UniProtKB/Swiss-Prot annotation:
Phylogenetic lineage: Eukaryota, Viridiplantae, Streptophyta, Embryophyta, Tracheophyta
Topology of the protein relative to the lipid bilayer: Multi-pass membrane protein
Intervals, Cytoplasmic compartment: 1-16, 87-105, 172-179
Extracellular-facing ranges: 38-65, 127-150
Family to which this protein belongs: Belongs to the Casparian strip membrane proteins (CASP) family.
Protein's UniProt name: CASP-like protein 1F1
Cellular component GO terms, alphabetical: plasma membrane
Main location: membrane
Transmembrane domains' residue ranges: 17-37, 66-86, 106-126, 151-171
UniProt subcellular location: Cell membrane
Keyword vocabulary terms for this entry: Cell membrane, Glycoprotein, Membrane, Transmembrane, Transmembrane helix
UniProt source species: Ricinus communis
Amino acid sequence: MENVEDKYNSPLKSQKLFIGAQICLRIVTIGATLAATWIMVTDKQSITFGDFVMVAKYNYSSAFKFFVLANVIACACSVVSLLFLCALGRYSSNPGHVFLLFLHDLLMMSLVLAGCSAATAIGFLGKYGNTKSGWMPICDQFGQFCNRGTISMMLSYLSMVCLLILTVTSANKSRQIHV
């Protein structure tokens, strides 16, 4: 019975599972942040009222600019961390290396969460407005712009969840550090 438990709970199998999960989650994070960035950057809609043309673009809002920048940074840093993880390969069981991944994932998760929060706040104003401040909703007129922005934010929230899972797994693995 002990041999069966040792076989399924061996450190090597645990290490392979950890690395496999890390690689898969980082690939999903890279894809989600890249897609969120691309959708938001290409999000533009124009409407015409007689001779007057109104345009909605992501770069008209500092919150959307921050959202895009946060996703670009998270995507680039996730690519670097994926390369770091692949380069370490067998040596990634070093608790010091895992702790660096934990810090990286925590910072990237915080950055993506901040970007998502800023974009969500502006998206909420765009959808519902704020009558007390005199801000009217614009999503009635700019439906395509708002829908694409919503998809971009959903992808970014997906990447934030992946980064949260990476943070938790790295924190769990780095508990082996002996001071």
